[in-house]
Amino acid sequence: MEGLLTGKERSILAKVNIGGSSLSLLGSTFIVGCYFFFKDLRKFSYKLVFFLALSDIFCSFFSVVGDPSRAFFCYTQGYSTHFFCVASFLWTTVIAFTLHRTVVRHKTDVEDLEAMFHLYVWGTALVFTVIRSFGNEHSHFGSSCLTQKGRTSTAIHFFTFYAPLWGVILYNGFTYFQVIRMLSNAARMAAGISDREYQVDARTDTKALNRWGYYPLILIAAWAFGTINRVHDFLYPTHKIFWLSFLDVGTAALMGFFNSIAYGLNSTVRRALHERYLTFWNDGLSMWLPKSRKYRAQAQPSEMVSLRVQDQH
């Protein structure tokens, strides 16, 4: 269906945006909570994931919160969303750069570059947000502020968001390709070693390779329909395709949720959650069970640990 969106269609898009952004907000908040709750996660690598999740929190928050009926709040919502969404995908380049510098170039100075990372992410996001404000007006539907339609406005939006976005996608793809290629070669070399410890490490690296291969696809999944929709808006500024707008809004709103699963919910986080769950469960049993059962409940985990140790050696 082509043409201007009806009030009902705009209401549907607003609800889709709220639903997807809420999932992203919950997922990103969970990752931030894990960073503060588990001291073992407060390493530099996960610190970068923390800032990624923090950007996603504010991107999702400003996507659904505001007062579009007032011009000031409408501008605040629109530009804040733009700023933090740009910062979000820029943090993925920092993570890719850090991994490449550590694995491929064998550098250990990445923590010394933290100040430069912040200057790069927040400074670049601010520059693109300021550029977008030139000659740009805002309108709204539902609870969201949208850029005023027109070729000039669409071109500005594309230049300040989608152009750097696809530059990030290309950079991440190339960077992870180099990292994966190098670790694949190392895994093939380890496969010829009879030592079981090296074979376990090789299988671990293979799991990491499979996971890293999906990282560049997250941004593609989140923004491919948005890119197509912006191109369509530029070519046909007075026409809208509802199903394309639906996919655009829905996938973009889920970016933070995708990031929280791929970057945040890694094996280290899952292991920390599992250990916390076992501790909580065992403490609960010790409070309610009699002494005889309490002894058996404490003895069984130790046997499981010994079995795991035997399996690993």
Where are these regions (language model features)?
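Membrane-lumen (extracellular) interface motif
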Residues: K39-R42, G66-Y75, S133-I156, I228-L247
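Extracellular-loop-to-transmembrane junctions of the mid-late helices
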Residues: F128-N185, N210
